[in-house]
Structures are given as C-alpha cells and as structure tokens.
Amino acid sequence: MRPSNRAPDQLREVEIIRHYTKHAEGSVLVKFGDTHVLCTASVEDKVPPFLRGRNQGWTTAEYGMLPRSTGSRMDREAARGKQSGRTQEIQRLIGRSLRAVIDLGKLGERTIHLDCDVIQADGGTRTASITGAYVALHDAVGFMLANDMIQESPLRDAVAAISVGVYQGTPVLDLDYIEDSACDTDMNVVMTGSGGFVEIQGTAEGEPFQRAAMNRMLELAESGIRTLLLKQKEALGL
C-alpha cells in the first residue's frame, strides 16, 4: 500500500495554471499534489557568445528551491555563494528536455530562459519543472508570434516528464517525498509528445532492479506522460 493510498499506476492530482505572473512572456504554476513549481519563460534579444553571428537562438534553464519549500529551512544558494551539484544537474536536465522539442534556428538570435522555482517540495520537483516549463515555453513562443518577432513556431513537439520507482517491491508512478526517500529504485523519464525518449535517469537506491521491473517502470512512465501531455494540451486550449 502506498502512503498516499494511490494505486501503483496513479498520478497525483495535476494542475497547470497559466499566466500566473504578469511580467514574463510565459508563466505557469504547476502542481503535482503537494509539489508546486513556478515556471517562467523570458525572451531575451541576445544569445550566448558561442552562438553570436550564427543566426540561431538558445533555450536554457535555471532551477531553484525557496528556503522553506521543504520541511526545514535551507539557506539560499546565493547566500552560500555557489550552486549545489544537484541544482546544476537538474537545470541542465530541464534545458536539454526543452531543447529537444524546439528548432533553435527559428528563434533568430534570441534566448528563452526557463526559470523553475520550487515553492513547495514533495518529491518530483524536476519532472514537474519540465512539464510546467514546456507550457511556459509554449506561451512565450505565442508571445513572439503575436509580436512578429518570429514568423513560425519553432516548437516541433511537446515534452513532459514523470518519476517512477520501486517502492516496497512494487513499481509505482509519480513518487512523493515519503516514497522517494524510502524507495529501492528511483527513475526519472522525459518523453516527447510523439513518444520519443529524451532522458531516462534510473538508480538502484537499495536492491538492484531486474529487467522486468525496469520494463514495468517504463510502461508506467509512458502511461503517466501520456496523461500529462493531455493536461498540457487542455491547459493550452489545444
């Protein structure tokens, strides 16, 4: 039995709220149960030095957690003077996931920054960030089209992500913090709307997992991501 009484293949309640802030070209509050992440997309008319003069854009991401997004307060990374390895890993994952579905050549020399700030954490913050950031990116692209900054959408596909794992011997979908902290296996899966895998990150935390368990986790992830892709479409009115 899962602590939340969910079935093994059951997502937490997912909510995607668009236009959550007024300044960013795209902004979304995404909720996976008690995990809440604010995702904003900001358009900037310049690119990193390595892309200057190539008439190509860039999409990148930053990730952070508010000091009291968890059970006990933690210092801001800015106050500590450096980002943790975990933060760097997560924001690179978010950036890779979004770049997998955007044609950077259609952006011109512009950068879209995705900022994902965890307001409240209860497991699955990186996968919630990817799922919400895509919707914010979609809205930023809509802003660019409406303001004649670009002539056609650079988005090639949708992208969403979910966690899966083995908890008390059973493969389960969308782990919350209690499950994540006690699971035998933890895996994050990122997929596109057309069914392609962008990334699979899986680690045995306790007992090594067998091929059958891995196959079942991937089946659960695919099913969960299909639901998330539909949630994204509903939020975007597509």
From Swiss-Prot:
InterPro entries registered for this protein in UniProt: ExoRNase_PH_dom1, ExoRNase_PH_dom2, ExoRNase_PH_dom2_sf, PNPase/RNase_PH_dom_sf, Ribosomal_Su5_D2-typ_SF, RNase_PH, RNase_PH_bac-type, RNase_PH_CS
Binding site for phosphate: R86, G124, T125, R126
Region (Disordered), start-end ranges: 64-86
EC id: 2.7.7.56
UniProt GO molecular function: 3'-5'-RNA exonuclease activity; tRNA binding; tRNA nucleotidyltransferase activity
Enzyme class, broadest EC rank: transferase
Keywords on record: Nucleotidyltransferase, RNA-binding, rRNA processing, Transferase, tRNA processing, tRNA-binding
Subunit structure, as described in the record: Homohexameric ring arranged as a trimer of dimers.
Identification of the protein by name: Ribonuclease PH
